[in-house]
Amino acid sequence: AEYPNDVNLTVYWDP
């Protein structure tokens, strides 16, 4: 799933 980080606007992927 995609989790956008509001701090640096980077998308993190959860395996």
UniProtKB/Swiss-Prot annotation:
Q: Name one GO cellular component term.
A: extracellular region
Indicate the principal place this protein occupies in or around the cell.
secreted
Q: Where in the cell is it found?
A: Secreted, Cell wall
What keywords sit in the KW lines? Cell wall, Secreted
What this protein is called in its record is: 32 kDa cell wall protein
- Organism taxonomic ancestry: Eukaryota, Viridiplantae, Streptophyta, Embryophyta, Tracheophyta
